[in-house]
Amino acid sequence: MDNKTPVTLARVIKVLGRTGSRGGVTQVRVEFLEDTSRTIVRNVKGPVRENDILVLMESEREARRLR
């Protein structure tokens, strides 16, 4: 990874559910470590649980809610 690429750290506060055609993606609510008042919903591929720290390459995009 390039040192010039800005990244944002976020902590998983709640696992919302599984999504994707085969359930391979997990939808989670995360709060940013720099600004704990700001939370967004993201899709995560792979194993994830509450209190995990995610490295977000792009922090403005929010996932659509599960139906």
Swiss-Prot record:
> What are the record's GO terms for cellular component?
cytosolic small ribosomal subunit; fungal biofilm matrix
Classify the source by domain of life: Eukaryota
Question: From the UniProt record, which GO molecular function terms apply?
Answer: structural constituent of ribosome
- Mention one GO biological process in which this protein takes part, according to its record: ribosomal small subunit assembly
Write out the entry's keywords from A to Z.
Answer: Ribonucleoprotein, Ribosomal protein
What family name appears in the similarity comment? Answer: Belongs to the eukaryotic ribosomal protein eS28 family.
What protein name is recorded for this chain?
Small ribosomal subunit protein eS28
Annotated source species: Candida glabrata (strain ATCC 2001 / BCRC 20586 / JCM 3761 / NBRC 0622 / NRRL Y-65 / CBS 138)
**Name of the gene this protein is made from:** RPS28A
